[in-house]
Amino acid sequence: MSGILDTVNLRTQMVGQNRLELLLFSLETDQVYGINVFKVREVLQCPELTEVPRQTTSVKGLAHIRGETIPVLDLSEAVGRMPIPKEDHRQCFLIVAEYNTRTLAFLVRKVDRILNTQWDQIMAPPAEIGVENYLTAVFEFEDKLIEILDVEQILADIYPMHTKVSEALATPEMKVKAKAHHVLCVDDSSVARKQMQRSLEDLGVKVTTCNNGKVAWDMLNNLAEKGNDVTELFLMMISDIEMPEMDGYTLAAMIREDPRMHTMHIVLHSSLSGGFNVSMVKKVGADGFLAKFNADDLASVVIERIKKVEQRS
């Protein structure tokens, strides 16, 4: 028990310090990949899977783990690589993770180690590879290029998310009010940025997107240096937590420490839900936490903010 508590305490101390832990793994080649440990519930040898008729190709079946039935995705096949042969499944591993309030297991060939590093060592993918890919970040380790997959993009291709805001929320009256407001959305996942932008524009809000915390901070800082009141320019900022170069915790903490923008309304948005994130959001001074992704939940947070601002004016 003391070991578990030590791990929790270590991760708690990492919050706001731009640090992260990555679980390294490989698929059907020598390429090494990483996944944020915060998203991982457990790693185990692949058990026998129950096949599901007429399922998506990359969904290999269901695993029964600790009384829970969890869908298993062949991560290699999901990203367009060779699938792991069925006869090899029992020699492979499952990474059980939580994304967008959904518990899934990713089938991988090997699991290597947990690496403690810093977000400012994690870089956005090279622009030359284009936008149609499953990478969200890369970093160098022991002369190797480690790739961090955009799991949200992978899951969106398998389980498409609805971005339409319900008519009960996106009323004609609210759309008129929303047109006067501008929301800053920060996320390293291209699919997450598109989801937020589509939903908020459906509501009527103007949207600016940034692909990581550093890009957002540089933009806000430049605006402030030019004499702009960013808290007047933006109704609020909705930011992912896990991002290359600067994470959402650090971005929120830096905004709170800057007298030019410290009153900005900040909501942190993550595919990893749970009490841990909620408590850490409070620690760095954010105003709220929102689990990914539900269009109406996102719209409700923005509508609530619009109403509060209008009450004060």
Residue ranges of model-derived segments:
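An acidic, low-aromatic, low-complexity terminal/linker signal
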Residues: M1-M237, I241-T250, E257, H262, ...
